[in-house]
Every structure is written in C-alpha cells, then in structure tokens.
Amino acid sequence: MKQIFILFLLWFGLSLSAQDQISLLFVGDLMQHQAQIDAARQGDGYNYNDCFRHVKKEISEADMAIGNLEVTLGGKPYRGYPAFSAPDEYLHAIKEAGFDVLLTANNHCLDKGKLGLERTILMLDSLKIHHAGTYRNPEERHKSYPLLIEKNGFRIVLLNYTYGTNGLKTDAPNVVNYINREQIKKDILDARRKLPDVIIACMHWGVEYCSFPERSECELANWLIEQGVDHVIGSHPHVLQPMEIVKDPRTPARHVIAVSYTHLRAHETVL
C-alpha cells in the first residue's frame, strides 16, 4: 500500500518501510516585510543566504516541500506590507532551501497588479519551480491546472484557492483561483481524471491572528473531503490553528485537515 506522510516542519505519520511512501512538507506563508528586505540589503543587491539556515535540513529532506508564496516578485521598488514586492534573490533562496512547489493564490497576489502577477509567474518558471493558484491567461490555467506532480512513483494533485485579493480586481486575461464551490467542484473532477494517488486542497482563508477557525472554514473543509479531496491544508491566519485527522466512513482512508499552519518567514509579532 502506498503511504503519504504530510509534514509541517515536524515529522507526522507512522513508522513504515521506505518502500511505497513519500513525505510531503507544507510550510506557512513565505513573506517579506520591509524590515526583512532592509536587513537583506547588501551593496547593490540582497543576500538571503542565511534566511532558511535553521530549517533547510528539514525542507531538503522531504520528498516534496510546498510553501505559500505570499509576496509578488514585481520588481523594484521593493516593498513590504501592505503591497508586497520582494527581491528576486528571495526566490533564489527559497529554491536553494529545497522548496519544490509554491502556491500563489492568496490575498497579496495582486499587490503589484497585472505586472506583478505575470512577473512572479515568469520568475517561478525561470527557476523551474512548480506553482499553482495564479495564471497569465485561461489557456495557461487549462494547461497546467490542477497541478499534477509525479514523484517517487506517486501522482500528487495540488489545488490552490484564495478567499480574496484585498479588494483588488484581476486584470484580464489574468486568472486568480478564488474560492468558488462551483469552480472547485469542476476542478476536483478534472483532478480525479488524472488518476492521482492523492488530491490536496490548499486554501487561503480564515481570520488573521484568530486561534480557531470560523465555522464556514470547517464546513468548506468537510465539503472538500466529500467532493473527493483527500487532505485540506490552510493558510492566512498567521497562527497555528487546530488540526484533525478525519476517518472516512466509506473507506479505510484518513483525511488530514490543517486549517492554518502559521507563517514561516515574516516580520510580525502576535501578542
């Protein structure tokens, strides 16, 4: 039987033989506030060599590492909150740390408008980093979404959606994956046609700095499982919220629902 481990910078799962198993590591929001950008400034460029030094081992040891890229790579001027545009060197550091997949559907993906969305995709493609959530046009989305990755004999599908984009509207022909049940249901059907071993929905939702999820998130998570999603991973609140493992009443399967798993790189203090 194939076994999938889901990790949150801590090992999660059962001790099994190395055969027919894969480890997936999910981390929270990868951000760049102004203090971080200023601290990385070095001469005419930016140096992020030490950015992930304390967690690089865990990231690189996972078979697949997935993070939420909650900045744009919109070019200069580089800015932190409220409209993020991170230096390209930050993405290089993320790649060097061992990340394989970055999620881009979040409330900051339109911070630098059409240019920022498209340049972010261009940079991700240039470094051959898999990504899901935003697209230059509908044709690009149709071609590459749902995101299917084959690794260690596994077929893994990743879905990614956001609750909103801070009131900013998407400029045609760009596409942002917003949370829309009708569209998500179609995407899940498309995902199932790819005959994956697992479908994981990565949702950008919830209330910032709230220790517990809203009822609407719990209902949506359960709906996703009912539609055929195997696991649900959440982001946006910037704090760790309860995680549960749900037994499937119809099969021996167990579903991980992690509503929020906080951020990995940011410059914020929660009291």
Task: Please identify what each model-predicted range represents.
Residues 4-13:
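Sec-dependent N-terminal signal peptides
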